[in-house]
């Protein structure tokens, strides 16, 4: 593969550390750390035993627990984008249990300190907001885009557009016509509106230190203009 050429391929288990690191850089880079000595370290020694990394890993396993297809963009041997999709009918019980066990093994030691408890509490609040959004719509969607991330240095280079189109092609091949995704004000949700998705729900969430977060549910149809 020529230098600087982008390759879209399926996510492999060996990519999980890179997935966690991308989540950490996107949402937890400013996370204040507590003492997490003794927890399993990241492959990146600079962030070893950090609260931010463990919260990111918990997020990753939460997403993987319901993912049925995942793809990454690789350039020069480095993952610069990832997208996870789910067709609920294809999610297995063993898959859910395997990833929930990983989540629990990461979360339990974090209960021993205040920073860890606060981080977990915030994650749960967002998950509850997402569940409330899906219940409010009353729709039984065929598929979900579970996670969609592009590394900061790769934004504006067409990486996100290619990844998004790749997932929609996958949905199309499976006969999926309608899908949804969760997003919030920490994300570039304007991308989804540009792709033709419609906002189907919004929920306001109060976080620590008086911060406010708006959580959204967007829905789209395969074969509409977002493809």
Q: What is the role of each PLM region?
A:
Residues 27-70, 75-76, 132-134:
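Active-site rim helix/loop that mediates acceptor-substrate recognition in acyltransferases
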């Amino acid at each position: 593969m020529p230098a600087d050429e982008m390759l879209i391929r399926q996510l492999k288990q060996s990519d999980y550390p890179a997935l966690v690191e991308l989540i950490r850089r996107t949402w937890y880079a400013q996370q204040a750390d507590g003492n997490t000595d003794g927890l399993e370290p990241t492959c990146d020694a600079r962030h070893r035993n950090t609260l931010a990394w463990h919260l990111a890993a918990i997020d990753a396993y939460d997403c993987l627990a319901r993912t049925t297809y995942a793809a990454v963009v690789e350039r020069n041997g480095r993952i610069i984008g990832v997208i996870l999709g789910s067709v609920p009918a294809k999610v297995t019980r063993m898959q859910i249990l395997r990833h929930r066990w990983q989540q629990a093994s990461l979360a339990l030691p974090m209960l021993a300190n205040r920073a860890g408890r606060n981080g977990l509490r915030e994650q749960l609040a967002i998950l509850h907001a997402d569940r409330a959004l899906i219940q409010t719509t009353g729709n039984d969607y065929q598929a979900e885009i579970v996670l969609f991330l592009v590394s900061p240095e790769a934004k504006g280079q067409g990486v996100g557009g290619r990844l998004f189109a790749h997932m929609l092609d996958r949905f199309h091949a499976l006969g999926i016509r309608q899908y949804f995704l969760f997003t919030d004000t920490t994300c570039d949700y304007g991308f989804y509106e540009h792709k033709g998705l419609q906002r189907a729900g919004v929920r306001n969430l109060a976080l620590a230190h008086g911060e406010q977060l708006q959580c959204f549910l967007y829905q789209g149809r395969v074969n509409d203009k977002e493809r």
